[in-house]
Amino acid sequence: MQTLLDTAHCRLTLYRYPRQLQDPLQAWDAADEYLINTLAEEPLERDGPVIIMNDGFGALAAYLHGHAPVSVTDSHISEQATLANLAENGLDPHAIRLQDALASLPDAPALVVIKVSKYQALLEQQLLALRQVATPATRVIAAGKAKDIHSSTLALFEKYLGPTRTSLAWKKARLIHCTPVATPTERPALANPFPTVWPLEGTDMLIHNHANVFSRTSLDIGARFMLDNLPIHSARKVIDLGCGNGVLGLSLLARDAEVEVTFIDESHMAVASARLNVEHNLPAALPRTHFLVNNCLDGVAVGSVDRILCNPPFHQLQAITDHIAWQMFSDAHRVLPKGGELWIVGNRHLDYHNKLKRLFANAQVVASNSKFVILKAIKR
């Protein structure tokens, strides 16, 4: 496991979060290195706020620590990784400000550094937010995998900010340089396309999705399969783990006037979407709900829930990994009381059946089709 980011301009020890003993994935990528090298060679020349967007595990926050940056992310995991890696390198975590991706940005930033993901909706939302604060003196520099930077990516920068150019590729990463045109008050107003709203078929409910929520414009097929096979007998207290827009928990609230649902996700936008969907569709059910941005079930009391519903992700940022699903299952086993149930939906090829058997010593197939399987495990 490579943990030392050692360049001509910095030497940092960095870990992914949660830290694992045998983690084959490192906590930075070539785009981080490219940004660090470029910022070192072209240092900041004016005072003003420094904004970092989508810093995966804190490499950029650690490098720019001396500028007291505002680190903007939708990911609770990224926030915790940033704090842990700052401490790992003897840097004061209180010198930076962590901010979720829905909060307002500081005015007139001197520098904005963006990690570009392959999901353009989040980038568009962030560029729209930057449009409200960036000035012609703001330096905007972004980086990502070269394969994820397309003409449509550059078009977004030009639409919301101003003239844009790209760098040569380096280690399969590429930079984007953008020069904002005009001041926020001089720019014409543009419509905000977020959150997106679509009808949940078979109901009179409207589903709201913020920019970084999976399957923004329709019900994803895994969730659809789970909705078709939700448990007939309700539990008193249920957790919708990895809730996304909250459609599973929302459906439980709609059909059972007694159930209490806790919506948990590591994405701020996911939990905000779940809350918005309950507020819009079932406002009377709000007293029976809780909303938590969290790393799986960290801090959730043992025996505090009767059933957990879960549609596990199999990637962290852009890396494919099964450790998140394993942590979700392990946390569920810890939190559930005897007789408590974990219900999951997943792709058939992911072998969740054997993982559940290792933890719970049982796993029952509730339903399956050519692509998905729904499994139930009971705490003995």
From Swiss-Prot:
Q: Where in the cell is it found?
A: Cytoplasm
Give any Pfam family that matches.
Answer: MTS
Asked if the record carries the keyword Transferase, the reply is yes
The record's keywords, sorted A to Z, are:
Cytoplasm, Methyltransferase, rRNA processing, S-adenosyl-L-methionine, Transferase
Catalyzed chemical reaction(s): guanosine(1835) in 23S rRNA + S-adenosyl-L-methionine = N(2)-methylguanosine(1835) in 23S rRNA + S-adenosyl-L-homocysteine + H(+)
List the CDD domains hit by this protein, alphabetically.
Answer: AdoMet_MTases (cd02440)
GO CC annotations?
cytoplasm
Its Gene Ontology molecular function terms?
A: 23S rRNA (guanine(1835)-N(2))-methyltransferase activity; nucleic acid binding
SUPFAM superfamilies on file: S-adenosyl-L-methionine-dependent methyltransferases
Q: Which InterPro entries match?
A: DNA_methylase_N6_adenine_CS, rRNA_m2G-MeTrfase_RlmG, RsmC/RlmG, SAM-dependent_MTases_sf, Small_mtfrase_dom
- Highest taxon of source: Bacteria
Give EC number(s), comma-separated.
2.1.1.174
Q: Where is the signal peptide?
A: none
Known function = Specifically methylates the guanine in position 1835 (m2G1835) of 23S rRNA.
Q: Spell out the family assignment given in the record's similarity comment.
A: Belongs to the methyltransferase superfamily. RlmG family.
Q: Which PANTHER family match?
A: RIBOSOMAL RNA LARGE SUBUNIT METHYLTRANSFERASE G, RIBOSOMAL RNA SMALL SUBUNIT METHYLTRANSFERASE C
Q: What is this protein called?
A: Ribosomal RNA large subunit methyltransferase G
**Protein species of origin:** Aeromonas hydrophila subsp. hydrophila (strain ATCC 7966 / DSM 30187 / BCRC 13018 / CCUG 14551 / JCM 1027 / KCTC 2358 / NCIMB 9240 / NCTC 8049)
What gene codes for this chain?
A: rlmG
